[in-house]
Curated annotation (Swiss-Prot):
Pfam families per the UniProt record, alphabetical: DUF5852
Ranges where the record places region Disordered: 68-90
Compositional bias ranges of the Low complexity kind: 74-90
Protein name as it appears in the record: Uncharacterized protein 040R
UniProt organism field: Frog virus 3 (isolate Goorha) (FV-3)
Alphabetically ordered keywords of this record: Signal
Segment forming the signal sequence: 1-26
Amino acid sequence: MIRALCTIVLIAAGVAVALYLSLVYGYYMSVGVQDASWLTALTGNRPDAKVPFFDKAVGEAPEDKVAYTERPYPVSSTQSPTTTQSPTTTTLKPTTMAVLASIGATPTPVVCHNVRGDMQGIACNVVMKKTVAAALKVQPEAKKDNVNAQYRYGMWTPLRRSRSPFGVWNIPKKLAIAAPDV
């Protein structure tokens, strides 16, 4: 059922793209494009097109310097973000640590730069490192020649509902294991 639905959706998408391209082709042919290729006219990739910066020699400024140097916001030369930064170290919440431990990542200390002075934790840089101990652990029952092991570890069957709807990543179970009750 799902396979047939996906096939119908893909065919409908292909028909829509073909119809769109034929309409665009008919429009450009009826208007009378000077270029030989209607696709070139559609993409605008013509050699006579004038593009700022790109039709200039290297190092040559464009004609209208003001259009490229004006900024829509005021810039103060006396205030620099680098002079007002005060690095502060913060610690992560236990739930965040549990989530990171469940995926095998250990965070380095978080350094937050308080740029404006009124917002805590702005521009925090977190660097994650994978630990060697977080390698995949094979269940001892899965190593045996057990016929039912394939249904318990790795494969999903509609007859058994022992897995969560998240599939391979059983998030609530991993959080319960990684975050002990405090």
